[in-house]
Amino acid sequence: MTQPQKADEKPRFFRDEDESVINLNESRSLFVQDEADDSDDGQGHVESSSEVSSNTSNHKERFFESLKEILGENMISSSQLHTLWSSYGLLKDGISIAADKFFEDKELLSKSKTESKMPAGDNIEVIDLSDEENDDELSILPSSSQLSQLFTNKRTSTQAGLESPMSSDKGRNRWSRYIGSIHTMGFATRPTVKPVPIGSRLGFKKSVPKDLPLGKSLQHQHCSHLVRLIDTSQDRELGRMPEDVARILYPLLDYSEQVSLEPYLLINNGKRFSVGDNIYIRIDCYLTSQAFVRIEGGSILNKSFINDHGMDTRQLHRAGAIMALFDAINIQPVYGDTKNEMIPNYQENTVSSSQFQDEALNINQLKSFYRITQSAASLQNLPETTPDESLFKLQLRRYQKQSLSWMLKREYEYSHLSEKAAEVSIDGNSMNPLWKKFRWPSNSKQGTPNHEDDCFFYANLYTGEFSIEKPVIKTIINGGILADEMGLGKTISALALICTASYDEAHEKKIESTKKPSMKEMSSQVDSSPLRHSQHKHDTYAYRTTLIVVPMSLLNQWQSEFEKANKDLKKRCEIYYGNNIKDLRAYVLGPNAPSVIITTYGIIQSEYGRTSTSGLFNVVFFRIILDEGHTIRNRSTRTSKAVIALRSSRKWILTGTPIINRLDDLFSLVQFLNLEPWSHINYWKRYVSVPFEKGNYAQAFDVINAVLEPVLLRRTKNMKDVDGKPLVSLPPKEVIVEKLQLSSSEKRVYQSMLEDAENSVKEGLAKGDLLKNYTNILVHILRLRQVCCHLDLLKKTPDLGDPDLEDLENSTQNISSILMPKNIKSPKSSISQDKLDALSANFRDIHSASEQLPSFECAICTTECIEPLSAVSITECLHTFCEPCLAEYIEFQQNKKLSINCPYCRMPISEANVLKLKEPIDAERGYELISFHSHFQSTKIKALLRHLKQIQETSPGEQIIVFSQFSSFLDILEIELRSHLPRDQVIIYKFDGRLDMKERTRILEQFHDKDLSCIKLLLLSLKTGGVGLNLTCASRAFMMDPWWSPGMEDQAIDRIHRIGQQQTVKVVRFIIDNSVEEKMLRIQERKRMLGDIVEGDEAERRQKRIEEIQMLFQ
């Protein structure tokens, strides 16, 4: 026992910094003093027994009651009260000294806790954190074993009462269940006169204003001052909560009947709280019966807000707070075993390199998205349906039979399914994708509502709604998305569907039933019935016609495929150009309606908005199929709006790439399919676009997966069937990168262009306005790529449709001034016209005119009969050589810095003075020589010619594809190849976006016809050739220039390497060494590793492109 405190010492109750508070509140002292004490002499001596007056017993009672008020009745026992009275009861400020002593004496404090009224079995550990620095700790503390076990019994005792049915409300039992706890650290704002007991039940109160102004986002408000932590035993403020926790609590305090939040003091160091002290608390969270809604027939989805104002501000804040609460208590949704394995971890980056750490969502995660739909559809176990042989000519592969079953089910055409397939029906009541399934914590299992499955509950964290029953959404659309990888035969699958179910049988039966009505029906009033109305002259349902919408290049291919597949002569296919059928509406509603109408996206766009009553928009088709459906991905384009405005009872989308650049690419597909409510843009933005733009990829893709799971089917070439065999067996594919060296003249031009580009990038980086110079930089890169292809491209102003300039449409800069033609100087010949005439005369004398053209021999490779004659190079000494041989010899001598002499006679020659025969070449009229450099030949064209001549010698009859992105380069290639290859041995076709439909059809038909006597060469635009074409007749391809995205090139190659290909596919990619093209390959490899970037918005797309540009100049 310590000595009594001297009377003149200040009682230790508040910290020194709070003394001012005490002085200001002396009139409101917390301690009750006896009036007799005021006359005390201040020495603090103990009164003798002779001075004890008759009011001593009252003084003792006041002493006991004051200590109980300060310390709490449950914190101090009767024996302790008497001990403190006997030592300090008669001292001045004895109550204050006794309270100090109570907390300073460890033995007394321990004895107090042992004797206090606590539940049986409680074992409370006191953790002394008085000397720890906690200022930098996280506001929400991690749950350790020590924290989670602390006060377990106390929570259980409290919880037990809450789990029991609550007071009856209009005859209904009310209940609540524990879902988790938040461990957090608040801070004291008021001093306490005594320590708050560990495990004390605290409370929360909201400060005014109760609501934020309408439209205010809680994310931009400070909430810590709006939520007060209350000591319920004293009904006074104890402290405040950290900002992130307060932001959760603030909206939920208005909904305490639905979400119960119970704070308990978690840790105390045995001292009273002073201003600024840390307060460690645990907030136990409960859901009550009032939080749950009854879901009937998916009505909850109809209740969900479709526009931005469907929920008031309080509801929006509540929904956000509940989502944050579930994150804080770390309660996770429950998935099925398979699906749980397939859920991608969108936040985890599998690439260790630091330069890739800030990448946006990538194609690897898109593959995970596809895998989820594939897994959910149980692809390997899908039943098979074989089309009727009397209706369909072709033999389907196994996976195509499965897709036919799936498509028939999506249209609810069960009568056409095989017996086995018909046994498995489609579940039209899939779980609402906004809702998630959660498991009740195991320690709250008792006293649950009386349901079959009381282990789970369902929550819509986007709206803050809860349900005990599974919330479902009925999928009522007839159709879906067939997203098989390119080359797996989506066209054949769609044609099998058309031939199997070519018309609306149910509608036809209704029509038949109205043709011969009974007497009873005739006498009844049925004029307003749907059946009578369907026979009205204004009926627009073409129930026997499927409309197929395709890119123009595929128009005739689809018609040809239909003719190959269809075996029913009653079924017809028509192509609709817009003006070839005078009255489309009357045609498809008439008795001779075609089974299939094929048209293009362009025709639909041109008819959109017209007032005609006979076009596409005045008919409700039986079925609409969009081939290359990603064409409508941009919802703001006229084409997309037009296609979405088409009407039918069944809708299908065929695309190998549902997502191209943005997650919002899917919205137009969803809108076309009428997937309610996702087809409303505000709904889509709220649950998909906005979360994705904010970096919450998991949330956005979680919704997308759930939305598309029932309506999307995708298979890839690498997948295997139930027997472990690949879905398709394709021949090998070889892709070879051939690096080329620029010629000396090309190098000079390239280096000049490169310096300009680097200066522009460095200037932008130095000024910090690289994005402002975006247009300039793209043009510089375009010019560098053009140099790598052909110098003549620099003499032309590129069309803004070129791939590199597709992002410049909205530029405010004067693009024309940037793209001014460049003066590219070729090596200037020193031969005058008179000398040239003299050399021509001498050449004619050496090679006398005759009926047959002479055979020129190359003195380097000794090839006799150089063909064509346009490939003959002639020196000043009039010796002839192959153009590639002489060019290679001159370049070798220049690189070695050796003198250039004629390989035949050793006479000095000059690159600038090399000659060639002037075209047209006519031996009867005599030869005329011109300077070779009047027509420049690029390094890539030389390499291509070398390969083509080898193929010509070893594989006559080969069909070859030459890809390029630049239409102007295809023009140059056509001229060069025609002039250097014998016309009777090589046939050249050119296919790009400038051709009309008839020309495209003619070229493809002629190219497909194999001719063993000659090579057929198709010059193909990468953009045009990457869409839908079937080019399996060819097995060799050359890629003349690279593109940013490897996917674009892969799509083009897949036009060749697909079902129907019988030979090994060989692809050669020409890349200029140590150039911008070589660095583009690195970017492609980077994208293959990380995946093609899916950006949130246009600014992010541009920022990613700038990062790629910086890589080009590193």
From Swiss-Prot:
One of its GO terms (biological process) is DNA repair. SMART domains: DEXDc, HELICc, HIRAN, RING. The keyword Cell inner membrane does not apply. Residues 25-58 are annotated as: Disordered. ATP binds at residues 484-491. Belongs to the SNF2/RAD54 helicase family. Residues 45-57 have a biased composition (Low complexity). This is DNA repair protein RAD5. A motif (DEGH box) lies at residues 627-630. GO terms for cellular component: cytoplasm; nucleus. Residues 471-676 form the Helicase ATP-binding domain. It is an enzyme of class 3 (hydrolase). One of its GO terms (molecular function) is DNA binding. Probable helicase, member of the UBC2/RAD6 epistasis group. Functions with DNA repair protein RAD18 in error-free postreplication DNA repair. Involved in the maintenance of wild-type rates of instability of simple repetitive sequences such as poly(GT) repeats. Seems to be involved in maintaining a balance which acts in favor of error-prone non-homologous joining during DNA double-strand breaks repairs. It is found in: Cytoplasm; Nucleus. Its EC number is 3.6.4.-. A zinc finger (RING-type) spans 858-906. PANTHER family: DNA REPAIR PROTEIN RAD5 (PTHR45626:SF22), TRANSCRIPTION TERMINATION FACTOR 2-RELATED (PTHR45626). Keywords: ATP-binding, Cytoplasm, DNA damage, DNA repair, DNA-binding, Helicase, Hydrolase, Metal-binding, Nucleotide-binding, Nucleus, Zinc, Zinc-finger.
